[in-house]
UniProtKB/Swiss-Prot annotation:
The modification Phosphothreonine is found at residues 370, 394. The gene is Oprm1. Forms homooligomers and heterooligomers with other GPCRs, such as OPRD1, OPRK1, OPRL1, NPFFR2, ADRA2A, SSTR2, CNR1 and CCR5 (probably in dimeric forms). Interacts with heterotrimeric G proteins; interaction with a heterotrimeric complex containing GNAI1, GNB1 and GNG2 stabilizes the active conformation of the receptor and increases its affinity for endomorphin-2, the synthetic opioid peptide DAMGO and for morphinan agonists. Interacts with PPL; the interaction disrupts agonist-mediated G-protein activation. Interacts (via C-terminus) with DNAJB4 (via C-terminus). The lineage of its organism: Eukaryota, Metazoa, Chordata, Craniata, Vertebrata. A lipid is attached at residue 351 (S-palmitoyl cysteine). This is Mu-type opioid receptor.
Amino acid sequence: MDSSAGPGNISDCSDPLAPASCSPAPGSWLNLSHVDGNQSDPCGPNRTGLGGSHSLCPQTGSPSMVTAITIMALYSIVCVVGLFGNFLVMYVIVRYTKMKTATNIYIFNLALADALATSTLPFQSVNYLMGTWPFGNILCKIVISIDYYNMFTSIFTLCTMSVDRYIAVCHPVKALDFRTPRNAKIVNVCNWILSSAIGLPVMFMATTKYRQGSIDCTLTFSHPTWYWENLLKICVFIFAFIMPVLIITVCYGLMILRLKSVRMLSGSKEKDRNLRRITRMVLVVVAVFIVCWTPIHIYVIIKALITIPETTFQTVSWHFCIALGYTNSCLNPVLYAFLDENFKRCFREFCIPTSSTIEQQNSARIRQNTREHPSTANTVDRTNHQLENLEAETAPLP
């Protein structure tokens, strides 16, 4: 690292690694990924949470109207679809008893992380348009930490789902004891605790800074800053991408071998069909996650190792990587709707309730009330019976 990367060195806006005095771009406060030395890179937004708080510096010093409209439209679509879809997934899992399986408990955790991530998009959009962070220091800390929490919790949950599928396919007897909703909830809590190992420090490191008339939401590092920034990026690359992807690859490799070598896993064709269907759904969700997140991780690690000159292609590539990462947060509900019959049926019942569905819900409520208040239920039954007798007695004779 040369002297230009020393403490206090700040590059100008012609450099994509320019400081936060440049006009912010979406995800700007989440960017540690473009480091030109000790100064946290303000001109490179980082959706992945690999970055601190700065923005990609447009060549003109401010975004063009077409760029701004395009980014705002994309973020708005992702935000609306992501929030609605993920909250619908969580509602379906909580609402329907049949959906409370171990796999769906993990899906609930994934939907929660994705919903939190998409909830930060309105703040990023305002930051992009205004060229400054107007929401104060507390929200700065919350938004940055949510970004890191989402990244780590999502990949840890997908890792857990892959291991869960491996146990279900390759060790079906052990799966009966291990794969329970209660254990799945405990594992979810553990995933959030593990994610706190990065989420909480980032929350304390996040702060707002005033630079040349604008406010930036950024991460602060001890000296030498360039060392700690690059160390953070490398650790995130290893623990939030390389290792989980290796674990997922091994699990699915073993599952594929098992599925090819054994014609029947459970002794029942119907159970086997469901097992393979769920395994396929989890595999697709994992594959989409890897496709959406690989570009940003590769981009960030390359940026940490070499200097990439500012070009139109570089700017477009960066925004494409960010958009791809955000898009993953709203894709999962769509995948569930197409790949899982139970989710598809529950989504349909929620959006277009039929008379039979309403009757089933009413019957379920009546049964629940009967269990919770047996004396009241008996009183209601007696009252209804008395009313029926009274109506029969007072009815006109034929």
